[in-house]
Amino acid sequence: YFSALAKKFIPFGLDSKMLIRGIWTGTKAMAENDGSITNEKRFWQSFALFMGQDILRLAPEFDKFYMHEFNNAKQMVGFTPLAHTCTQLLKDKGYRLIAATNPIFPASATQNRLRWAGVDPNIFDFITTYEHCTFCKPNLGYYREILQKAEKAPGDCLMVGNDVNEDMCAAALGIDTYLITDCLINSKNKDISTYRHGSFHDFYQFVQELPSLNEASKSNEEE
């Protein structure tokens, strides 16, 4: 990712090490965002403060990068067909889907990352990206924003993820959770026994056993 980014912007006269430090500075600012402005605005404020205001004229080039060259990072990302299988089955059963990925990227980049995983971005009701979110994981404000936008109570939702710190923290709000352990991220070495957890195949079996909301809705209509 960073090597592709540097390669893209060296022709514009940017120092690659300075650029990468600037990206990290902007990313840190987003991670500490307080809900007052979007992550996008927070990133560009911090990035421009670090790099100089002239960097703002290259904003369209960054958009192009995330739409095109960013895809070169696909080879570094794991893939399982079960990601598509599970999301499609949930959709077919009538569940609303939200791609609750850490909103540190623009929409174009996040949609590409979903495609790398074999998942159609259009299957989701909405996707959390830096244009619309004002918090990042693991700030609980991030999950509160999702609940507000989805108009759902915590008990009506399930957060599925592989990061113990960033995804399972949703349980603090009363959101049910499922920790996928195939590519487990547990930077703080937390005890995962308190969370429902299993492999992607285990999760697929879990999804198969979930009731169909379509059938429940049809039954209520008949009554």
Where are the regions a protein language model picked out?
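Active-site neighborhood of HAD-like aspartate-dependent phosphohydrolases
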Residues: 1-21
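Glycine-centered loop/turn motif at secondary-structure junctions
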Residues: 10-13, 52, 94, 118, ...
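A metal-dependent, Asp-based hydrolase signature
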Residues: 14-67
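Short amphipathic alpha-helical segments at helix boundaries and their inter-helical linkers
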Residues: 27-41, 70-78, 133-142, 171-176
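Short, contiguous strand/loop micro-motifs
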Residues: 31, 72-74, 97-98, 129-130, ...
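Short, acidic loop-to-helix structural element flanking the phosphoryl-transfer center
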Residues: 38, 42, 56-60, 67-98
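Asp-based, Mg2+/Mn2+-dependent phosphohydrolase catalytic module
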Residues: 84, 88, 104-105, 110-223
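A cross-family glycoside hydrolase active-site/sugar-binding cleft signature
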Residues: 100-102
